[in-house]
From Swiss-Prot:
Gene3D superfamilies assigned: 3.40.50.360
Name of the protein this chain belongs to: Putative NrdI-like protein
SUPFAM superfamilies: Flavoproteins
Domain of life: Bacteria
GO BP annotations listed: protein modification process
Organism: Streptococcus pyogenes serotype M3 (strain ATCC BAA-595 / MGAS315)
Pfam families: Flavodoxin_NdrI
Molecular functions per Gene Ontology: FMN binding
Classification via InterPro entries: Flavoprotein-like_sf (IPR029039), RNR_NrdI (IPR004465)
Entry's family note: Belongs to the NrdI family.
Length: 160
């Protein structure tokens, strides 16, 4: 059974709810085993992630509008520290952001910042707890990212 790891942080429960539903969907529809790592449970510990993973990050920013102020991440920095440690960023297939669209420019801004900072793609986004459509859409995106990564690992150089 193929495996994918989801590395995330959940503070209010929205992201945890999404990850649980996404994990069930991946297991039921793609026969994937999903390993979940909730950074909140680690209490600032880091360790090397040996397998490919997808990061999922809610948006928590200081006040402002996300354009000329309010771009500084708060509360979720342990996820960034975890990704930065032990070369974990190199095994990250990409990031999925969550947020509240009422915050306009700040919506998923932290995930966009992580994508730029670490050089991996922003795979998608969902609002609040996410909808069933978000689950199926992002599961497909994860499967495609995992498949691309697996293809790159198995390619061999032609004989010289």
């Amino acid at each position: 059974m193929p495996q994918i790891t989801l590395v995330f942080i959940s503070l209010s429960g929205n992201t945890l709810s999404f990850v649980k539903r996404l994990s069930l969907y991946l297991a039921d529809n793609y026969d994937y085993h999903v390993k979940q790592i909730n950074i909140k449970d680690l209490k600032h510990e880091t360790f090397p992630v040996k397998e490919e993973f997808v990061a999922i990050l809610p948006t928590y920013l200081e006040g402002g509008n996300g354009v000329d102020s309010g771009e500084a991440e708060i509360l979720t920095t342990p996820l960034g520290e975890f990704i930065a440690a032990h070369g974990n960023a190199q095994r990250c297939l990409g990031i999925i952001g969550s947020g509240n669209k009422n915050f306009n420019h700040q919506y998923c801004l932290t995930a966009k910042q992580y994508a730029k900072r670490f050089g991996f793609p922003l795979l998608g986004d969902f609002e609040l707890r996410g909808t069933p459509d978000d689950i199926s859409r992002l599961a497909q995106v994860i499967m495609e990212a995992s498949s691309r990564h697996s293809s790159n690992d198995t390619q061999t150089l032609p004989n010289s």
